[in-house]
Amino acid sequence: MNKRATLIYELKNLKKVYQQRRVISIGRLQIHRGTIYGILGPVGSGKTTLLRHLAGLESQTEGILKYDNNEFERTWLGKIKVPQEIYYVGEHLVSAKLTVEQVIKSVYPDKSNRIVKRYFRGSVSKQILPLSLNFLSPGQRAWFDLVLALESDPRVLIQDNFATLFDNDMEFIARKELKRMNKDLGTTVILSSINNHALKKFCSVLVYLENGHITKVRSGLQKQRGDYSKK
């Protein structure tokens, strides 16, 4: 298989401008399918903006972003048609009046018991089940959102601020399940964090951002596969 055939994303001269301020400016970045990527950088470095572009939630000001060798399809009004196989954690609407357990049983009726045993057995996480979504703390909501993503079997899973609000048990389970998903299903996983240690443990490729530019790409646990250039 040639190198281009393994690409799932390709970015060229990608720029995003908000109110005359350039937030990201990426000369070139290639993301390969079936790989776990970590996007690292300080607050304000452009991580969230980059992830939202990869998810099809925002349009670039300039440049090219290809998913599966094609730019995203658009409606006649110019809005991006987000592919259903791309899952951006936290972007899927569910009724805030329902409890966590009710949502799980509603969305995944055939495997709700397994989900509860797998993700809500810890001393902290098990307290989440009877709570309504509108009463969840930011950390509890982040865990619930990730659980929905892990069980949705997406082709691409994207999460901003990975593990920022998790305790040690939650972070361990999250890493374990993301690695399982990647290994068993071939899911491309793209995570961001300000914490180098959180992603270095299990990402195959680490992409470092600063002031909207890629400053370096380094291999994590496996051989480096991402290619980039600054501009």
Region roles according to the model:
Residues 2-27, 76:
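A short, flexible loop at the N-terminus of ABC-type nucleotide-binding domains that lies
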Residues 40-42:
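The feature captures the beta-strand-to-loop junction immediately N-terminal to the Walker
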Residues 55:
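Helix-to-loop junction immediately C-terminal to a conserved catalytic motif
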Residues 63-74, 80-82:
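Conserved ABC transporter NBD signature motif
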Residues 92, 97-111:
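Q-loop/switch helix immediately C-terminal to the Walker
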Residues 157-161:
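Catalytic Walker B motif of ABC-type/P-loop ATPase nucleotide-binding domains
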Residues 192-194:
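H-loop/switch region of ABC-family ATPase nucleotide-binding domains
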